[in-house]
Design a protein with these regions (language model features):
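Regulatory activation segment
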Residues: 31, 44-53
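Protein kinase catalytic-loop region centered on the HRD/HxD motif
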Residues: 1-13
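Activation-loop N-terminal segment of eukaryotic-like protein kinases
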Residues: 25-29
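Residue immediately N-terminal to the catalytic "proton-acceptor" Asp
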Residues: 16
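Conserved protein-kinase catalytic-loop position immediately C-terminal to the HRD catalytic Asp
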Residues: 21, 34
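Regulatory extensions appended to serine/threonine kinase catalytic cores
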Residues: 159-169
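C-terminal lobe helix-coil module of Hanks-type protein kinase domains
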Residues: 55-160
Length: 169
């Protein structure tokens, strides 16, 4: 999935709706990201939207506010998708789409290991870094995310994922 996002981002395309329903596995076992229906071509500036775009359970805080989207919005949605893959549930749920959107904007995401205790430390921190509220605290590129995912395969319990302090701009 991250490799598919990386390919899209290299072509300056922001998906804006990364979620399990938009991930398919071919008969050959290849994972593909689908449904670029609300994708936008990214330019040197960010994408502005007057309406929130994406599926609310996987939506980044900036999308929930109806604001700008860039590659880091896809990274957030990937983090939510990974969270669900690891725990079997999304971190935020509610009776209305607005209630879920507000949680994406305001509430901290619990570490996946709080739900599924067998999640390794490095994977916990990868998910938490992907899902930071401020874009500046997330992975800045999918390439950086992929590097940490690969490292987590060989050093799952190592504490190598660095998350910027809360006061970072």
């Amino acid at each position: 999935v991250a490799n598919g996002m990386e390919a899209a981002h290299k072509h300056h395309i922001v998906h804006r709706d990364i979620k399990p329903q938009n991930i398919i596995i071919s008969k050959e076992g290849k994972v593909k990201v689908t449904d670029f229906g609300i994708a936008k071509a990214a330019t040197s500036s960010t994408i502005n939207s007057s309406a929130a775009m994406g599926s609310v359970h996987y939506m980044s805080p900036e999308q929930a506010r109806g604001g700008y989207s860039d590659e880091r919005s896809d990274i957030y949605s990937f983090g939510i998708t990974l969270y669900e893959m690891l725990t079997g549930k999304v971190p935020f749920d509610g009776d209305t789409t607005v209630a879920v959107a507000v949680q994406h904007i305001q509430d901290a995401i619990p570490a996946p290991s709080e739900i599924a205790e067998d999640v390794p430390l490095s994977v916990d921190k990868i998910v938490l870094k992907c899902t930071q509220k401020k874009t500046e605290r997330r992975y800045q590129t999918v390439s950086d995310l992929i590097a940490d995912l690969k490292k987590s395969l060989v050093m799952p319990e190592e504490d190598f994922v660095k998350i910027a302090p809360m006061y970072a701009q």
